[in-house]
C-alpha cells in the first residue's frame, strides 16, 4: 500500500522506488535502464576527455598521458570512461540474453531496432579503441578496416575512402574521432525509437504469472 498524500514530502529517489511496477517484471528488466545510465556516463566523461584529446597521430598518445598525469581528475574521467564501456557491453549482452530467453525476438520491430543499436555500439567502441593510437590501436585499425577489402569490386575503394588515403594515417584518426563523437548521439536517437516501438503494442506478461496478482 502506497500513501500518496505524503509522497510530495519524500525524497525524489524514494518517489522513484515507490513507482508501482507489476510483479511479473523481474530484475532482468533493469538492464535497459542500466544501459541508459552507462550511455549518459559515457557521454559526460567522453565530453571532458574530448576537451583534452588531440586527433593527431603524433600527439594523440601524448595527449592521453597528459590527461592522466597533469589534468586534475583526468585519470578518473579516463578510467570511468573505460570501465563504463566494459559495463556497457556486459549490460547489453545480459539485456540480449533476457530477450532470447523470454522470446522478445518475436516483437520484430523492437528486436531489429535493438540489433541496429548493437551494431552502432560496436562501431562506436571500435572507433574509440583506435583513438589512443598506441600499438594495439594501430593494429586494430589496420586489421578491422582491411576486412572491407573482402567486398567484391568496391572493397579497395571503400577501404581507401575510409582511410582517407592509401594507408592508415592522420586523416584516418581524425575521421575516427569525429565518428566516435557523433555516434553516441545517434545511439540516443535510436534508443528513443527502440523504446517507442517497445511501448507501441502495450505490455505483455513475459513471466506468465497471474496478471491479477497485484
From Swiss-Prot:
**Keywords, ordered alphabetically:** Electron transport, Heme, Iron, Membrane, Metal-binding, Mitochondrion, Mitochondrion inner membrane, Respiratory chain, Transmembrane, Transmembrane helix, Transport, Ubiquinone
How the cofactor binds, per note? Answer: Binds 2 heme b groups non-covalently.
Q: Which family does it belong to?
A: Belongs to the cytochrome b family.
Please, what other remarks does the record include?
Answer: Heme 1 (or BL or b562) is low-potential and absorbs at about 562 nm, and heme 2 (or BH or b566) is high-potential and absorbs at about 566 nm.
Q: Name one process (GO BP) from the record.
A: mitochondrial electron transport, ubiquinol to cytochrome c
Give a short account of what the protein does: Component of the ubiquinol-cytochrome c reductase complex (complex III or cytochrome b-c1 complex) that is part of the mitochondrial respiratory chain. The b-c1 complex mediates electron transfer from ubiquinol to cytochrome c. Contributes to the generation of a proton gradient across the mitochondrial membrane that is then used for ATP synthesis.
In which residues is a ubiquinone bound? 199
Q: Where does heme b b562 bind?
A: 81, 180
Spell out the coiled coil positions from the record. none
| Segments crossing the lipid bilayer | 31-51, 75-96, 111-131, 176-196
Q: What is its main location?
A: mitochondrion
Under the heading Pfam families, the entry gives: Cytochrome_B
Q: What membrane topology does the UniProt entry give?
A: Multi-pass membrane protein
Give the binding site residues for heme b b566: 95, 194
Which cofactor does the UniProt annotation name? heme b
Q: What is this protein called?
A: Cytochrome b
Record note on quaternary structure: The cytochrome bc1 complex contains 3 respiratory subunits (MT-CYB, CYC1 and UQCRFS1), 2 core proteins (UQCRC1 and UQCRC2) and probably 6 low-molecular weight proteins.
**GO CC, one annotated term:** mitochondrial inner membrane
